[in-house]
Amino acid sequence: MNYKDFQNRVDHGMQMFDAGNIQAALEIFTALVNSDISDIDKSSMCLNIAVVYDKLGNVQQSLEWYARAIQYEKPHCRFEAQEYLATYLKQIDRPREALKILDSLMASTHLSEADKVRVRENIEQLKVEINKPVYRRPGA
């Protein structure tokens, strides 16, 4: 697929999503995942699909598509999908799982120094959130 065709399809999928035509967006992004685009672009389309499923309230499907995105990017020493998954896990109140992902990223040798700083900052924020005391009213 040439780049212009790819970009037109992505744009169309985004327009469908923004217009609330979720099914059309899913079909477009899924077709792109099943096409001859690069693994990195397939990973990005999986991330788009994960966002669509989250919008539909289907957390399990969303998590499955994040996992697929990670599988496409991992052989290429990329980690964008892992960071997005960690962010999503934090949003759905699963900070410990997010922390595990970011900790595993720090152990990898393919992070740039700037990446390490960003990931460390995210780890520290998660640790603060995890260790934040929870106050409950007596008898509640």
Residue ranges and their predicted role:
Residues 90-113, 124:
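TPR/TPR-like (Sel1-like) alpha-helical repeat modules
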Residues 3-4, 40, 76, 114:
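Residue signature of alpha-solenoid helical repeat architecture, marking inter-repeat boundaries
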Residues 5-35:
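Alpha-helical segment of the N-proximal tetratricopeptide repeat
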